[in-house]
Amino acid sequence: MKDHLQFYIDGAWVPASGGRTLEVVNPATEEAYARIALGETADVDKAIAAAKRAFERFSRTSRKERVELLESVIEVYKKRYDDIAEAISDEMGAPMSFARQAQAAAGLGHLSEVLRVLRDYEFDEIINETVVTREPVGVCGFITPWNWPLNQIGCKVGPALAAGCTMVLKPSEIAPISAIVFTEVMHEAGVPAGVYNMVNGDGPTVGQALASPP
C-alpha cells in the first residue's frame, strides 16, 4: 500500500496538520491499495492564504505568459498520460482502455480547448462607448467528484489559469490519486508557487472549510 500523506501548498509538498488518514479502495478488486491524509481546516487556511498571496502577482500576468504556462502544463500532462490513466483505472475500477481513451483524454481535451480559446480571447471589449474589461476574480475553490475526475479537474483548473486566478483544489477522497498525479504535472510544468494548491480531505471538514465565507 502506497502512502500519500502530504498536500501541495505554496509550491511544495507539505505534511498534513492532523493525523487522520483514509484508505483508497479499488472498486474492481475491493482492496485498499493506497492511503491518503485527510486535511483539517488549518490545511485549507494555509492553502487559501498561499493562493491569496500568489494572486497579487499572477493576476497581472499577460496573455502570453498564461499561454506559455498552459502549453507547459499540456506538455507535461502528455508525458504523464499513462500514469494519469493508470491512477484513474485503479481509483475508479475502470478498464485501462476506458481510462486511457476517455477519462485521461477528457482532462487533456479541456486543457487544450482552454489554450485554444485563450490565444484569441478578448479581455477588453468595446460596447457602444464603454470599454468592458474582464479581470481575474480572485481565489477559486474547487471541489471535484469521483466520477470523471480529470475531466472535472481539467474543466476548472484550465479556465482559472487562463483567467489569471489562483486556486485550491479538493478532489474526491475516494478517487484522489489521479489528482495527486495531476498536481505533480502542475509542479513540473512550472506553475508558480501558490497559484495551484491541493488539499485532500472529506466533505464535512475540508469541503466545508473551502466552501465557507472568507
Feature locations, PLM:
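Long amphipathic alpha-helix in the N-terminal Rossmann-like dinucleotide-binding domain
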Residues: 71-81, 94-121
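Signature tryptophan residues that serve as conserved aromatic anchors
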Residues: 13, 55, 146-148
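N-terminal alpha-helical segment of soluble enzymes
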Residues: 25-92, 118
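Terminal low-complexity tails and localization/encapsulation signals of metabolic enzymes
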Residues: 1-35, 68, 72, 122-143
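Short alpha-helical
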Residues: 42, 79, 83, 94, ...
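Short linear capping/connector segments at secondary-structure termini
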Residues: 87-95, 102, 125-129
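Rossmann-like NAD(P) dinucleotide-binding subdomain of oxidoreductase/dehydrogenase enzymes
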Residues: 123-214
